[in-house]
Swiss-Prot record:
Top EC class, one word: transferase
GO MF assignments: acyltransferase activity, transferring groups other than amino-acyl groups
Entry protein name: Uncharacterized N-acetyltransferase YjdG
Record-stated family: Belongs to the acetyltransferase family.
Assigned EC number: 2.3.1.-
Domain of life: Bacteria
Taxonomic source organism: Bacillus subtilis (strain 168)
Keyword Acyltransferase: yes
Record key words, sorted: Acyltransferase, Transferase
Record-annotated N-acetyltransferase domain positions: 14-168
Pfam families associated with the record: Acetyltransf_3
Organism taxonomic ancestry: Bacteria, Bacillati, Bacillota, Bacilli, Bacillales
Length: 168
């Protein structure tokens, strides 16, 4: 497990037991693993990606940090969302970041706080030189988050707006 902390949040990579509980949407099992949940996590996007995250964890015999992370409030261990990367850096050192906050925890700065910490962690790795992101054209919340983080719009495709992180 890889663990990062901010003032309010704890970010940690997802392990197989938590992934198993999430795949069954077993909120009691999630609580037994030490987390609080109001039932919003895992969301549908994360739920659909569980087979992919499991494959990465099995292939790597655990985590390298370039996979899925949960965002947890430090004061009560409630899972407020998730962030992470869509796999290891490519041969050019590029990785793609993603993030989501549970509906009841949006507009509280959790996503910016967590993603910034994760970006800093990734850029401290020798294998990472560039971070990208994408979001749907109508997802204004994610677009504002990306702008706050320092991403700039790189190009648009039929489905997504594609962003690139500009180091400060």
């Amino acid at each position: 497990m890889v663990l990062l902390e901010t003032n309010r949040l704890r970010l940690q990579t997802i392990d197989i037991p938590l992934l198993d509980a999430a795949s069954k949407q077993d909120h009691q099992a999630i609580k037994e693993l030490g987390y609080e949940t109001n039932g919003e996590w895992p969301n549908s996007d994360f739920f659909e990606a569980i087979p992919y995250f499991r494959e990465i964890l099995v292939k790597n015999n655990g985590t390298k940090g370039f996979d899925s992370w949960i965002i947890v409030k430090k004061d009560n261990y409630e899972i407020v969302g998730g962030t992470g990367f869509l796999g290891d850096p490519d041969e050019n050192g590029m990785i793609e970041i993603g993030f989501a906050t549970n509906k009841s925890h949006r507009r509280k700065g959790y996503c910016v706080e967590a993603a910034q910490k994760l970006i800093n962690w990734a850029l401290s790795r020798e294998t990472v030189s560039r971070i990208t992101a994408r979001c749907e054209h109508d997802n204004l919340g994610s677009q504002k988050t990306l702008e706050k983080l320092g991403f700039i719009l790189n190009h648009k495709s039929a489905e997504y707006k594609h962003w690139i992180y500009v180091t400060k």
